[in-house]
A protein has these predicted regions:
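N-terminal Rossmann-like dinucleotide-binding module
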Residues: 1-48
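Acidic/polar helix N-cap motif
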Residues: 10, 37, 56, 101-104, ...
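Beta-loop-alpha module in the N-terminal Rossmann-like domain of NAD(P)-dependent dehydrogenases
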Residues: 18, 51-108
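Acidic-histidine catalytic/liganding microenvironments
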Residues: 25, 48, 63-64, 128
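Short, well-ordered coil/turn segments that N-cap beta-strands
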Residues: 28, 67, 90, 117-118
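Helix C-cap/helix->beta junction micro-motif
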Residues: 48, 88, 114-115
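A contiguous active-site-proximal alpha/beta segment in oxidoreductase catalytic domains
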Residues: 99-142
């Protein structure tokens, strides 16, 4: 079975969780890491034995080897990075929350639809009160 080549954008705590999880998946391989902090990026690349590193996510997205990305950055950056990744032809695993407002969420969905790529949300706490409130707002069209 051929491995899916993955780039992880954001090397903080959540990015490390993703990188460690991918290491346990037989058909996945993290081939690139991206972080705006060069020291942290170098440390995580060495720890996870990842050769390709980027401090600019656009450079990672331009890498034709990368088929999918995990977006593990601060919440205010979820939408622009997810949209750029989908527009670059990458599948996207997007950490929660999807974004900070409904209009940006619609933009992400539109980018997904236009790209034909997969978008997966990391919503492991779907039953939390906050998630239920968001669900109710979406259903009410707000």
């Amino acid at each position: 079975m051929e491995k899916v080549k993955i780039g992880v954008i954001g090397c903080g705590t959540i990015g490390s969780v993703h990188t460690n999880a991918y290491a346990k998946v037989e058909n996945a391989e993290v081939v690139a890491l991206c972080d705006i902090l060069p020291d942290r990026l170098g440390e995580k690349a060495k720890l996870h034995n990842v050769a390709k590193t980027y401090t600019d996510y656009n450079q990672l997205l331009a890498d034709p080897e990368i088929e999918a990305v995990s977006v593990c950055v601060p919440n205010n950056m979820h939408a622009p990075i997810a949209i750029a990744a989908l527009n670059a032809g990458k599948h996207v695993m997007l950490e929660k929350p999807m974004t900070l407002n409904p209009d940006l969420a619609r933009d992400i969905i539109a980018a997904r639809d236009a790209s034909g790529k997969q978008l997966q949300m990391g919503m492991v706490w779907r039953q939390k009160d906050e998630a239920e409130l968001v669900k109710e707002a979406i259903e009410a069209g707000r």
